[in-house]
Design a protein with these regions (language model features):
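Short aromatic-glycine-(Arg/Gly/Cys) micro-motifs in beta-strand/loop hairpins
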Residues: 1-20
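Ordered hydrophobic segments in well-structured contexts
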Residues: 11-13, 23, 47-49
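Short, isolated positions in well-ordered beta-strands
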Residues: 21-22, 57
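A short, charged, amphipathic alpha-helix used as a generic interaction element across diverse proteins
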Residues: 24-47
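Short, mixed-charge low-complexity intrinsically disordered segments
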Residues: 40-66
């Protein structure tokens, strides 16, 4: 998924092992989805990227960000 797709520059990408895998329109949804994934697969690297500023944040677990 990239910024030229229908979601445009709004929302949040959920990045798993360096690859954009999921999308959420709301930050709270991105945090919940990424946290659930991280709890299920703790060995994977899970991050949330805000499309507005392209900033990446690491997900440490359910509702926990670095």
């Amino acid at each position: 998924m990239n910024k030229s797709e229908p979601h445009g520059a709004q929302g949040f990408d959920i990045v798993i092992n360096g690859e954009d895998r999921l999308f959420a329109e709301l930050e709270v949804s991105a945090i919940a989805s990424a946290g659930f994934y991280k709890e299920s697969y703790p060995e994977d690297t899970v991050q949330i990227r805000a499309r507005v500023d392209n900033k990446l944040r690491n997900v440490l677990g359910y509702a926990r960000l670095e």
